[in-house]
Amino acid sequence: MGIKDWPDGEGPREKLLKLGVGPLSDAELLAVVLRNGVQGLSAVELARNLIGQFGGLRELLTASEIEVCRMPGMGPVKFAQLQAAAELSKRISQQNLKRGKILSDPDLTRDYLMRQLADRAYEVFAILLLDSQHRVIQFVELFRGTIDSASVYPRDVVCLVLEKKAAAVIVCHNHPSGVAEPSLADRRITERLKFALETIDVSLLDHMVVGDREIVSFAERGWID
């Protein structure tokens, strides 16, 4: 059953237009994106099955085409609809943290980093460069692969900071395992970077470790001071 076949006022699209997006469940919002269900399943039921099968919206939206198209009723067209919705969400997040934006909201930073790094199958070490008023200069991915104290070079970080004339930075990396808890190696890297940045009078504001569903902040744990 497609959304257009729902009785007047009962479909998720009509509910959205009447009440706004807030009252809609994840399955109802996804049904609006999918538009149609399959034989024996409404669009909402199909959406609910997809979310349940993949374990959540983020897992569904980051799944491969092969994984999604294995599901009954899902093909290349519906996969493209999901990818478009996911990309729009990511681009909105990028615009919220665009160059010149004053970084005063920790939740905004968390949301941005989660969207950038949480779905990576490999480790990425990145840096958010800020000016003296904590306005965004640039987000740069520096290293990929196994991130440990031997693979992150403070010299490269310092060179980038000097090149971009940054006054403060937030470093971050993801854990593909999904567990955000920092390792001993993560803490060692942070200490080395903090020392290197202090030599050029640049502040290390935070080191954030991104997992599947959470971000651990070194600053919040008191590990930066």
UniProtKB/Swiss-Prot annotation:
Keywords noted in UniProt: Hydrolase, Metal-binding, Metalloprotease, Protease, Zinc
Domain MPN, chain residue ranges per copy: 102-224
Span(s) of short sequence motif JAMM motif: 173-186
InterPro entries the record matches: MPN, RadC_JAB, RuvA_2-like, UPF0758, UPF0758_CS, UPF0758_N
GO aspect biological process, one term: proteolysis
NCBIfam families xrefs: PRK00024.1, radc
Protein name: UPF0758 protein Ssed_0385
Organism taxonomic ancestry: Bacteria, Pseudomonadati, Pseudomonadota, Gammaproteobacteria, Alteromonadales
